[in-house]
Amino acid sequence: MNNEDISDKKLTLQGLSKLKLDLNLNSSASPSTGATVVKKRRKKSHDAEEHNLFDESKLCSLTEKEQIFRINAVQNAALLKERNQREEKEKTAKEDSNKEIDEKNEADALSKEINKQVLSNTHLVEPKEDSIDHEDNDKKSFKVNKDIYSKHSKLVIAQAIDEKTEQPPVFKQRFGIRGRKSKFTKGKNISREVIIPDKITIRELSIRMAEDSKSVLKMFKEEVGESYRVDDLVDPDIACEIVEKFNHTAKRVSDTNREKDLFFIEGRESLPKKPKPPIVTFMGHVDHGKTSLLDAFRESNVAERESGGITQHIGAYQITTKDKQKITFIDTPGHEAFTAMRARGANITNIVVIVVAADDGIMKQTVEAINHAKAANVSIIVAINKIDKSEPGDVEKIINSLPQYDLIPEGLGGDVMIMPVSAKKKTNLDKLEEAILLIAELMKLEAIEDCRALGWVIESKIDKAKGISATLIVEEGTLKVGDILVVGTTYSKVRSMVNHLGQREKAALPSAPIEITGLNGVPNAGDKFVVVNSEKQAREIVEYRLELIKKKKEDLGDNNLDIFSRNNSETEELSVVLKCDVTGSIEAISSSIDKLGKDQVKLNILHKAVGGITDSDVLLAEASSAVILAFNVKVDSKIRDLAKQKGIEIHTYNIIYELIDDMRMYLTKMLKPVTREVRVGFASVRQIFNVSKAGNIIGCYVSDGVIRKDSLIKVMRGGKLVHEGKLKALRRFKDDIKEVGVNFECGVSLEGNVDIKVGDILEAYQLVQEERVL
């Protein structure tokens, strides 16, 4: 029967059969109680009543009024029956709900009882005399935190109580309080890799090991035998030993190797190398056609003609030849910029093209350009330009004059290629391209592409629209958009890359010039860039470089460098730039100072010329770590300021013998000193004490001289050397002392595992360095 009310609806005879069917179904589905016989009897009588009520033969014999009365009676009976069934269902549902509530209350009561028993067993509650106050608190706590334990926890507690276990489970979490680990709880022993630089304090060492500074100080006291403070600098080798005592791994990192490690490519030998385009720079005298040659090559660029792009001035560009080979050109304003970049260590260029005008010949700046290129140790091609304006014999004259500048042409048995060209008429440009590619092939220029990118900065600028941008040339690897790179004392994320055609690029391969944006600072031309893994690493590198610059400024004062301190012991070479008033002075001084150089040291004249000192001379001296010698030449104040800024020394002379004596003195300073041993004392071993923590303590008697703490020790046994090393500790009684004199006893400890026997002789000595003279 449908739930909708049908009392207000008109009941027709046509719906009688449906009503009868619904009543039959409801009667058959209605529940009944009692015995089976009673059920059958009642069912039969009920069916008989309904059959009588809906007997159509009887209904037909009744009048219409009686039929309607009969139907209404049946309808009312059906509605009454439906209401009774609905009320019975609601009553049953209510009873079930009350039953669930009772069960839940019983469960909560049981849970409270269980919790009280567990807390009393695990001593998480106060003693019995305070139980009344805490009981109220517990009730409040349970009221707020009804579900403090999970179902699994309750099950475990119940099982523990049922089984009457002697040690019920203890839960770390207390009521309403998140479990916290005690700060006094010792964690797991974690082995760390600890970086040990050249200078490190105990405080910094403790932080890197994540150990208590008191424990580290105690370990130093036990191992070294001396008392330290947390801010004391310690020897890096001793620091490595202390790190290993704490079961960590020490990694020794020298500040001198840190920059080398930054540009180190792991697995370089196994990575595949591919040919890379040569990088070419045009140098020469003003108005000899360097820019015209560059423009001629640019106009002949196959890639530019095909793309129809507009060339962007980004300091460098790349052309594609007819043979689909690429050449990268650096567009510098002159050899001064070339040398300025080289002064920063940027040996970017592979090939230098010296441009000489056929109608002018070799000029002053041409000679400077030649000397700069030779100092950079790069391949040189001489391009004789403007042959369309030259007279017969001009080219041959230039070729024959090159040997006096140490450039031997191929026609004279040398290796310098000479190429007559015309930028205006575009004559022999293809041959100059072939010469460049031939030299590049002989040089076997290769680079790894599948690694992090590193390269050089060509130029940088600030644009109102783009912000700070820089032109880079990739030396190795592949530079991508999104890379984090470190350049100079700044780091940045590459936001965009544009080539010289103004086209956006997603990646740049080796020798490719590219303009990037998104820099945080303005880098200098010649700065080297490298891609790092994260901003954290980039920040650490920049902080290290800034600290290094700060230390150098403190050590060097007002940038007043001693040129000879910058010549390291490996090179043992003094480079000079010589400027004189006349050519006769140049020849006399050159021959005299050349004789001073011997096998131990070498004097190299980078550039010699008549005239005053120029900006180019200062830049060349900076790039080559050279000193400038000026004989009978005045030095302009601007040049002195520039030299002071660059850290270059200028020495002026009027007497040739003073110049030669100074050169002899400077070369003497460059000689390596002689190191010899000086014995300071002897001691005999009388007793050996085995101390577990500090190792063996050797009881000695000083028979001659003095034993100092900084002395080196030789252990002699029967006239033979048994051991040689450093003193680890020197004590008299329980005091640490610096030295022990003759006829006194002392206790010493040696570094390393030394086999010492009673009767051995300890020979103390020191190393003394003595200067040599030419």
Swiss-Prot record:
GO MF annotation, one: GTPase activity
Q: Which residues form the tr-type G domain?
A: 275-446
Q: Supply the Pfam families for this chain.
A: EF-G_D2, GTP_EFTU, IF-2
- What is this protein's function? One of the essential components for the initiation of protein synthesis. Protects formylmethionyl-tRNA from spontaneous hydrolysis and promotes its binding to the 30S ribosomal subunits. Also involved in the hydrolysis of GTP during the formation of the 70S ribosomal complex.
Q: Does the record's keyword annotation contain Nucleotide-binding?
A: yes
Output the superkingdom of the source species. Answer: Bacteria
Provide the residue span(s) of the region labelled G2. Answer: 309-313
The segment annotated G5 runs over 422-424
**Keyword vocabulary terms for this entry:** Cytoplasm, GTP-binding, Initiation factor, Nucleotide-binding, Protein biosynthesis
Q: Where does GTP bind?
A: 284-291, 331-335, 385-388
Family membership: Belongs to the TRAFAC class translation factor GTPase superfamily. Classic translation factor GTPase family. IF-2 subfamily.
CC per GO annotation? cytoplasm
Q: Which Gene3D superfamilies match?
A: P-loop containing nucleotide triphosphate hydrolases, Translation factors, Translation initiation factor IF- 2, domain 3
Kindly give the CDD domains that the UniProt entry links to this protein: IF2_eIF5B, IF2_mtIF2_II, mtIF2_IVc
| Localization, UniProt | Cytoplasm
Region of interest called G3, as start-end residue ranges on this chain:
331-334
The name this protein goes by in its record: Translation initiation factor IF-2
- Write down the InterPro entries for this protein, in alphabetical order: EF-G-like_DII, IF2_II, P-loop_NTPase, Small_GTP-bd, T_Tr_GTP-bd_dom, TF_IF2_bacterial-like, TIF_IF2, TIF_IF2_dom3
Query: Segment G4: which positions?
Result: 385-388
Residue segments, region G1: 284-291
- List residues traversing the bilayer: none
- NCBIfam families named among the record's database cross-references: IF-2, small_GTP
